[in-house]
Amino acid sequence: MHILRGGRRLISFSCNDYLNLTHHPAVKSAAIAAINLYGAGSGASRLVTGNHPLLVELEERLARIKGTQAACVFGSGYLANTGIVPTLTGAKDLILIDELAHACLFAGTQLSPAKTMVFRHNDVAHAEAILAASRAQYRHALLLTDGVFSMDGDRAPLATLSALCAAHDAWLMSDDAHGLGVIGGGRGSVAAAGDPPVPLQMGTLSKAIGGYGGYLCASAAVIDLMKTRARTVIYSTGLPPASAGAALAALEIIENEPELTAKPLAKARAFCAALGLPEAQSPIVPVIVGAPEAALDASRQLADTGFLVTAIRPPTVPAGTARLRFAFTAGHADEDVARVAQAVRDIVKL
């Protein structure tokens, strides 16, 4: 949370280490122990010799937490999405994707020969209209969404999307990079939505988990397909033992410390209440400024006050919606949350 930048000590409100597990003693010890036992790297693709026991254990743990039959670990979240989407879809298929879905989901669609259609953000009626008009023309349909949207912090209506996909014989895939560990009792966005059927649950090990890597939790058949067909699995070196060991330790903490997993959202909601903003749905809170220059200026003024808050500008976000993106963690002191809220009130016209 505390960083040095330009000789100044700042409190960061821009880091996705929501549970502050990157520096947790148990997580660091597990990474070191994994290196001592298995070495610094995996040495090869998982289909050759890179499938060390910690990866198998990690996949079993992820599947249990997500309530699926199996899981496949990838080298990163980006590698996961750019491997999963083209593996599941072909030229005779249809992909629907939320307009604000993460860039790596869009990258996955670009690697697939399937027809891709974009629906308005969280607009289930628009997605339904597309499926009603087009579904019959295609063999399979895949609907892609974030569980928690990384720039707006809002959640996808997963229960409604699940029912929609069931009605139109479509597969639903949710990217839970910003949900696991911080909502749904730590289990993520599907759990927070009441555990509707979401057959494809993807995520990352680099946010609340505090390490590095990506994963897909799904049926045993889908996971077998990924491990034998996904190019980002077959042609990538397996995740290093240290990353797998650290992730296992982090998941142990998440499963056994519910009070810790509840803190980031509580901090975000306290911030929103102080500023009169709508109640936060996740630890991510955007303060929309508008012009890129105004966002940069506000970020600089916050730094002068002792806070690191990154200005997010187009093309990362739509034109006219440049913003300060706040990410709240379990370790943020209540008084610092109150102070940064006051600083925003003084700097930004809300």
Curated annotation (Swiss-Prot):
Broadest EC class assigned to this enzyme: transferase
UniProt-listed InterPro entries: Aminotrans_II_pyridoxalP_BS, Aminotransferase_I/II_large, AON_synthase_class-II, PyrdxlP-dep_Trfase, PyrdxlP-dep_Trfase_major, PyrdxlP-dep_Trfase_small
MF-aspect GO terms: 8-amino-7-oxononanoate synthase activity; pyridoxal phosphate binding
EC number in record: 2.3.1.47
Record: residues binding pyridoxal 5'-phosphate: G77, Y78, S150, D175, D176, A177, H178, T204, L205, S206, K207
Classification via Pfam families: Aminotran_1_2
Keywords attached to this entry: Acyltransferase, Biotin biosynthesis, Pyridoxal phosphate, Transferase
Pathway(s) where this gene product acts: Cofactor biosynthesis; biotin biosynthesis
Function: Catalyzes the decarboxylative condensation of pimeloyl-[acyl-carrier protein] and L-alanine to produce 8-amino-7-oxononanoate (AON), [acyl-carrier protein], and carbon dioxide.
Quaternary structure, from the entry: Homodimer.
Protein name: 8-amino-7-oxononanoate synthase
Naturally occurring in which organism (per UniProt): Methylocella silvestris (strain DSM 15510 / CIP 108128 / LMG 27833 / NCIMB 13906 / BL2)
Organism phylogeny: Bacteria, Pseudomonadati, Pseudomonadota, Alphaproteobacteria, Hyphomicrobiales
